[in-house]
Amino acid sequence: MGSIFRRAEQYLDRIDDGAFIEIGSSRAGDDGSTNVIAAWADQRNKQLVTVDFDPAVCTALRGQTLSNVEIVNSNGEDYLRSTKGPISFLYLDNFDWDWHPLNTEDFVLEQQARYKQLGRTMTNLTSQMAHLNQAILAMPSMTLRSLIVCDDTWYNEHWGHYSGKSGAAVPYLIGQGYRILETEEYPTYGTILGRW
């Protein structure tokens, strides 16, 4: 999990009026993105919509006191297909990235097993496919001046391409007029794109 999303706050005054959407809600022990982004939205008299396909994650979030958060139990693609927009802030943080696919870490194996229970397959390829589809589905609802944050996604200087969860989505977003504001591998693992 990356923490670059925290740097997105400095760009929020540049975006149009629109919804704040998080695809992939916070889980116990992670970076706390849902609470942080909810606070940003609240400061702007907005609501955060956080979307997660795991009902247990949604139930845990509903147990917290998050007055300005709508919790939606859905996969990101279905939610974005049905939303009418406008969206000015989008955080793509669902699935997870297997940093060591030849020697997968235990926490990733646990997530892969949970995804399988819920009828989905979690691999690096399915993660990239999901994020690309979400970027495509979100585009008609994105405001002209908007921000998209991609978790666990960075520019790989050695290979000359974007790697990670949204590695396939970043070139598409650049083609839609977004520009890279920040991208970093270690230690924050993420990419922030803006269009204005």
Task: Report each predicted region and the residues it spans.
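A short alpha-helical cap/connector motif
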Residues: 1-196
